[in-house]
A protein has these predicted regions:
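A short N-terminal beta->alpha junction/helix N-cap motif
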Residues: 3, 24-32, 59, 309
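Short catalytic-loop micro-motif centered on adjacent basic/acidic residues
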Residues: 26-30, 91-92, 114, 231-233, ...
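Alpha/beta enzyme core
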Residues: 10-21, 34-59, 65-86, 95-230, ...
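Shared catalytic-loop signature of beta/alpha-barrel
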Residues: 53, 60-64, 265, 274-292, ...
Length: 333
């Protein structure tokens, strides 16, 4: 058993309370490798932003759970080395799909876990979530639950269509499970293809897809039912067109990739939404940088020469999200 406190991590409880009160959101960036982690820590340390390091089940299998624990410990020390005296870093399991997986992460030093039982019938979702909460809270680990289903594909999480969270269920769900935060479905979705072309309109000037707006009416209803309760948005990458264009110009094929407009995420950040998940954007930044190097320098085979620019591009992206979208800069001095 490894306590996250020994590693220097924090849970989300105080972080979320401040974010809800302050009208900003905490960035939750998924990572799979060292370059992504370096970029996240550099951006967070420079902006003094609290940050959530997210690891999916697939990423945990890819990176190895033991290595992840030491990467998280290294991230805390690296942040201090960069001049961030009191780093506020969470290590969070994204989309845990079983009690066993969540328990294993708690035991390995994660400071926060998500149990995603949203695909189960309502009462089964409550029962499984409550079981995870009871175990995690013994070790002061915070728990995110999900109510409603997001469409799209992210690692091993897939759903054909979304089902909006039903506001009339949230009080009962939060009370009976004891969860610390709630991921809701209001129209975001996983992956770089968040909407089908038939769900969108097209910009007459550029021909690019314009996604439908998020269901802010559902969000506001949930806020009324659970005032001050931490709300989470998954699938909130914006799919920057410049990265899509670079990828496509350098041998890639991402037609009609479309994400959540940043102005809608800014609006969400000012509400009870205190955690916004971003994964696909960093994948796109990394892939765009790597493809460009390979296209410009086809003889290059030193990984540092293409992963270095990828890391720099991701750092730039993370800083932009922190400062210009979520407003979390300066909130962890």
């Amino acid at each position: 058993m490894v306590s996250y406190k020994e590693i220097g991590l924090v849970n989300t409880r105080e972080m979320f309370k401040k974010a809800v009160a302050g009208g900003y959101a905490i960035p939750a960036f998924n990572f799979n490798n060292m370059e992504q982690l370096q970029a996240i820590i550099q951006a967070s340390a420079e902006t003094k932003s609290p940050v959530i390091l997210q690891v999916s089940k697939g990423a945990r299998n890819y990176a190895n759970q033991t290595l992840l624990r030491y990467m998280a410990e290294g991230a805390v020390e690296y942040a201090k080395e960069l001049g961030w005296e009191h780093p506020q870093i969470v290590l969070h399991l994204d989309h845990g799909d079983s009690f066993e997986l969540c328990k294993s992460c708690v035991d390995m030093g994660f400071s926060s876990v998500m149990i995603d039982a949203s695909s189960l019938p309502y009462e089964e979702n409550i029962a499984l979530t409550k079981k995870v909460v009871e175990y995690a809270h013994k070790y002061d680990v915070t728990v995110e639950a999900e109510l409603g289903v997001l469409a799209g594909v992210e690692d091993e999480v897939a759903a054909e269509e979304s089902h909006y969270t039903r506001p009339e269920e949230v009080i009962d769900f939060a009370t009976r499970t004891g969860c610390d935060s709630l991921a809701i479905s209001i129209g975001t979705s996983h992956g770089a293809y968040k909407f089908k072309p038939e769900q969108c309109t097209r910009d007459p000037k550029t021909g690019r897809l314009v996604p439908p707006p998020l269901a802010f009416d559902v969000l506001h209803e949930i806020e009324k039912k659970l005032p001050g309760f931490p709300i989470v948005l998954h699938g909130s990458s914006s799919v920057p067109q410049e990265y899509v264009d670079i990828i496509n110009a350098n041998g890639g094929k991402l037609p009609d990739a479309v994400g959540i407009p940043e102005e809608q995420l800014r609006e969400a950040s000012k509400s009870a939404v205190c955690k916004i998940n971003i994964d696909s954007d960093s994948r796109l930044a990394m892939t765009a940088a790597v493809r460009k190097v390979f296209n410009d320098k086809p003889g290059e085979f030193d990984p540092r020469k293409y992963l270095g620019p990828a890391r720099d591009e991701m750092k730039k992206l993370y800083m932009h999200k922190i400062i210009n979208v979520l407003g979390s800069n300066g909130k962890a001095e």
